[in-house]
Swiss-Prot record:
Record-given protein name: Peptide Hp1239
Positions of the propeptide segment: 40-67
A GO cellular-component term linked to this record: membrane
Signal peptide residues on this chain, from the entry's feature table: 1-23
Family of this protein: Belongs to the non-disulfide-bridged peptide (NDBP) superfamily. Short antimicrobial peptide (group 4) family.
Principal place of residence: secreted
Assigned keywords, A-Z: Amidation, Antibiotic, Antimicrobial, Antiviral protein, Cleavage on pair of basic residues, Membrane, Secreted, Signal, Target cell membrane, Target membrane
One GO-annotated biological process of the protein: regulation of defense response to virus
Coiled coil: none
Summary of the tissues where the protein is detected: Expressed by the venom gland.
Job description of the protein: Amphipathic peptide with antibacterial activities. Shows antiviral activities against the herpes simplex virus type-1. It potently inhibits the initial infection by provoking the rupture of viral envelop and the dissociation of proteins from the virions (EC(50) is 0.41 uM). It also effectively inhibits viral attachment (EC(50) is 5.73 uM), viral entry (EC(50) is 4.32 uM) and viral proliferation after infection (EC(50) is 8.41 uM). Morever, it enters mammalian tested cells (Vero) and reduces the intracellular infectivity.
Positions bearing Phenylalanine amide: F36
Subcellular location: Secreted; Target cell membrane
Length: 67
């Protein structure tokens, strides 16, 4: 009885690992396809607006408040 219970638990754990890894791999594959697809490469120029190298007075005030 203990052996059957142990085999059942191990089987359940392995099935859970398989289902989670399949979901993670499909999520990663969709992300890779969206990055390297035709539309994905043209949309990367939109990210340039997020990285502004200038520090404004408001940024300095926020940093002072944090410290």
């Amino acid at each position: 009885m203990k052996t059957q219970f142990t085999v059942l638990l191990i089987t359940l754990v392995l099935f859970q690992m398989l289902s989670q890894s399949e979901a993670i791999l499909s999520y990663l594959w969709n992300g890779i396809k969206s990055i390297f697809g035709k539309r994905g490469l043209s949309d990367l120029s939109d990210l340039d607006e997020l990285f502004d190298g200038e520090i404004t007075k408001a940024d300095l005030d926020l940093l002072r408040e944090i410290m």
